Amino acid sequence: MLSLIADAPPHDAGFTSGLAYFRWLHELLPAPFFHTQAFLAFFALVLAVYWTIPRRFQMTRIWVLVIASFHFYAAWSFELAFLVTGTTLLDYLFGRAMGATDRPRVRKLLACTSVCMNLGVLCYFKYRGFFLNELYEGMRALGMDPGFTKLNPLEVIVPFGISFYTFEAISYAVDVYKRKIEPEKSLPRFLLFILFFPHLVAGPIVRAGDFLVQTRRPKRWNWLRVQLGVQLFLVGAFKKMAIADRMALYCDPVFKDPEAFGTVTVWFAVLAYAIRIYCDFSGYSDMALGAAHLLGYKLTNNFNMPYLAANVSEFWRRWHISLSTWLRDYVFIPLGGSRGGAWFTRRNLLLTMLIGGLWHGAAWGYIAWGAAHGLLLVFHKVFHDFCESRERLKAALDTWAGIGLRILVTFFCVSLCWVLFQPELGKALTVFEKLFSIQKGQTLLLSNWALWTTVGVLLACQLILRSGLWAQLHARLPAPVLGTGYAVCLCAALVLAPDAGTTFIYFQF
Amino acid sequence: MFRALFRLRPFVRTSPEGAPRARRSKRGRAALALVCGAGAFALLQVLFVVFTELSPVLSDPIYAARERQLGALRTEKPNDKLVLFLGSSRVQDAFRAGAVNGATAFNFGTPGAGPIANSLYLRRLHRAGHVPDVLFLELMYPLCADGGPWPQEGPLITADRVTRTERDLLIERYGFPGDLYRRLWRRSALVPFLTHGFKLIGRAAPDALPSNKQMRAAHGADDHGWLAPLEGLKPDPEKRDKQLAHYKPWVTDWRPGPWTHAALTDTFDLCRERGTAVALVLMPEGTAFRALPNPDARARIDSYVAELKAQFGCSVIDAREWFGDEQFLDGHHLLRPGAERFTARLVAEGIEPLLKARGAK
């Protein structure tokens, strides 16, 4: 199923009847993926135009980015680009209206309207099919006539990145309502906050407080920043093309048809999937950060070596940081956070993670994934409290061996949870059945040493980064050596990319 | 004024380390790194493209592997007559060239090679100094079928496998779609690392590729180019049906295509110029394959072969009916015992007479 998602054709239907301009645009930029030649050409053009405009015309630069971002989305679907722009305009107006009044009830009403509108759009596009189909199945099971036909999930068009920009808009409305930030007065700046193409389709989820302030700073061409941007973009491209797409060769066939494969192969596929999803999503995030840096903007860092986390709680402080902090600030804390008793906190953790699971996709698999992580967090909290009163156990867990063991156990749990991270729960359960009962079956056409090599290289890179060795080395390397390293990194990404690349997993969310 | 200068000093030196200067030097270093990176990338790309233009090692690894093997054989026995068998995977699997005595025989069968690929290969071999004394040329008639505006071999000879000169030849002489093929060629030249990446991995670390993409044809052949069919394989009806479905549209109402005829003509002309004797070979086929062309098409195939024989004065070895179905894996690729029998019969009926006629011992 994963590859079904990954290989799903871009939404082309609208282009057969759409305006000629948008059809032409779609031909130029058929899919909003950063590692394609079409995107690189588009980005080069935007960069050239953006930096050619003199610094004093800051607002013109912002408009250029807004227009480019709109075209970036419209090239995939112009109807949905208008939808996103329309809801953004309404969010802007709600924000301005909240800023214009001091009456608490009116402000609350406006904030609720903005939140409901965004959630409504999200539910209509993302969850309508799921809920209607579940309702249909439920009514049929009870012997009732649903009165409507079942929707084909493949025919339901979910706008790219809808979960990301609706969450950004919701956080803006809430922050304005709570007076954490001032409502944005400038329309182009607000449009850029939501539509900025590096983060539009797959995050990171930016906060208005972090981003809008950057739109006011005059941007200067800074070689250090450009270098950082290029470096991030290259690392992201390498992660995506050379690692994630290669790992897909190990896991996609198995997750597509788990029945056919033997237990050992399925275990390898689970390991490969854990690597794939990390490199795919963090690779995308790195590219987004790199692209933003090249335009003079700084986005939130979304990953911090999550597989080196020593417990699940730490994992969530390192994985998809922009989402986990969003869930903490706008779901967990409003639910009461850990201010109540132990059971109250556990309930809140479970609820937050369930919402996190549902955010990823309208399917039981994602909900189960969220629930599993919620349970892991609860278990971790219980274990943590248990260890607090046992000094020797605590000390043992804080030794090198203890930390290593905790990292391994955390990685094991998180990897098993990834099995649930797919729309079809039935397939996930088949994978679990295969994992925990020795069964014979097909093996993959690939040799496992490439998988182990990838694991080794990835681990070594993370350890080098964590130890700070890379930071020291980077500062001392002569510029030509560093530059040649960039070239080699890019060439290696191109060489190692499998001939049939896949889309980004997180684009579906 | 003196005082003013003194006042300025701390302003210029904001920190003991001289931070503004350090920042400038960091920026300069960043710019230099980026320029060097872009330059190195461009240079690597250009070198790669130049390398693929000069050598087929990365662009066409199967051909390059065969040519290397042939070169090694020729170095061992430089005075031997050279018997070359150009053809498709049917030839590659079927002809154990090492069994030929009294001459250096080499199986130059490569997957998907029809008359156009064979013509290109013969040109390359001539350039590399390998001029055969006797050439056995497979007439892979499904690939000679008139398939509309483009030759059937079009999708098989991908743009990344050929040099610029060969690209122009394919477009001008063999009916390859000019705009599309040029665009594809330019694309492969623009991002050679992406285009040739899996070939590079296939050469450096074949295990990193799925086993069906490891190009066994390039690495698994014996010294004489024979890719021996695996031991113990049996006829596979499922594979046969798949192959039949693949070839059916080309063969059922077969007519000779103009482009492949041009390629065949060129091959014969090249051979005549270099004094090479040519024998056309129709490779063995199972009954289901033989039944694919309708009676009219079959008659057209036979008459086309007769025309070629008359026009170019070559000998023809029609091996289509040499074996029963039990000798084929999928209806047209011989199994190991079939390959041994084919080789023995070809040597006796085709190679030895031709070699004798050429004065070999």
Annotate each PLM feature:
Chain B
Residues 1-30:
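N-terminal Lys/Arg-rich, disordered targeting/topogenic segments
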Residues 29-53:
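Hydrophobic membrane-insertion alpha-helices, especially the h-region
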Residues 51-75:
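Alpha-helical transmembrane signal-anchor/signal-peptide segments
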Residues 67-98:
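Short extracytoplasmic
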Residues 86, 90-179:
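Membrane-embedded segments
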Residues 152-274:
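Secreted/periplasmic serine-hydrolase-like ester/acetyl group-modifying domain
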Residues 196, 267-293:
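Active-site segments of SGNH/GDSL-like serine hydrolases
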Residues 290-361:
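Long, positively charged, glycine-interspersed low-complexity recognition regions
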